[in-house]
């Protein structure tokens, strides 16, 4: 399902297309930052970690640029209900992407700290695995938004549950290790902060997925029972209702 339908105003189509293109660019940039920061941590690559920290401002600048374009779009075009819902989702989504960039920066800073203090004896395999999972979640959420695919968005919500469980399991294991051997407490705690940052990336991917369901069903599914969300997605899919389209 296309993210937008054609409108009578070609200039509106062009303006909206420009915003969506920047939105996708920002999302992919944020996902890339998470991957690069994690690689820098595991490889003890200080130069790459510092580049992630330095490049965070690029994501911030994109957020400001998209915000400005959204404000102009609303002021000039006064979008109707269906299009306004999409514009609202874009506005909310860039906040999540900006925060993903912030989490990548935190991971990079922890990488620099661990390089300075010496490697942690535990936790790197957990970081690698969780990083792979949340990056795929984020990319799937971006793809679901691009295609306005509520089923794919719901799969992201399911993945978030698995990520949360893995995060909790890894945290318990590392806390047990600290209690049994306190010689490397500060280093392991830095790894715990990295795991926390990755778990938050998963939460932001979930938020993007919820925006897809909002756009396609017209229902705000934040803080909604999981089974109820599944029903909404199924009903939307069965009925062929995609609320971002102007019929």
Task: Give residue ranges: language-model regions.
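Cytosolic, long alpha-helical scaffolding segments
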Residues: 1-247
């Amino acid at each position: 399902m296309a993210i937008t339908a054609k409108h009578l105003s070609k200039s509106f189509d062009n303006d909206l297309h420009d915003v969506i293109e920047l939105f996708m660019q920002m999302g992919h940039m944020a996902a890339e930052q998470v991957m690069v920061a994690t690689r820098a941590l595991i490889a003890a690559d200080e130069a790459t970690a510092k580049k992630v920290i330095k490049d965070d401002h690029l994501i911030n600048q994109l957020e400001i640029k998209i915000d400005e374009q959204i404000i102009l779009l609303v002021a000039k075009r006064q979008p109707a209900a269906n299009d306004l819902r999409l514009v609202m989702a874009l506005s909310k989504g860039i906040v999540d992407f900006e925060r993903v960039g912030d989490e990548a920066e935190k991971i990079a800073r922890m990488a620099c700290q661990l390089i300075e203090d010496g490697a942690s004896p535990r936790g790197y395999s957990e970081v690698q695995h969780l990083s792979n999972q949340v990056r795929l979640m984020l990319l799937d959420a971006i793809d679901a938004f691009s295609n306005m695919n509520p089923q794919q968005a719901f799969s992201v919500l399911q993945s978030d549950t698995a990520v949360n469980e893995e995060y909790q399991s890894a945290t318990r294991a590392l806390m047990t290790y600290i209690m049994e051997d306190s010689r490397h407490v500060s280093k392991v705690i830095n790894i715990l902060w990295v795991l926390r940052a990755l778990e938050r990336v998963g939460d932001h991917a979930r938020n993007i997925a919820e925006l897809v369901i909002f756009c396609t069903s017209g229902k705000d599914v934040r803080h909604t029972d999981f089974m109820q969300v599944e029903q909404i997605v199924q009903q939307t899919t069965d009925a062929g209702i995609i609320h971002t389209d102007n019929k």
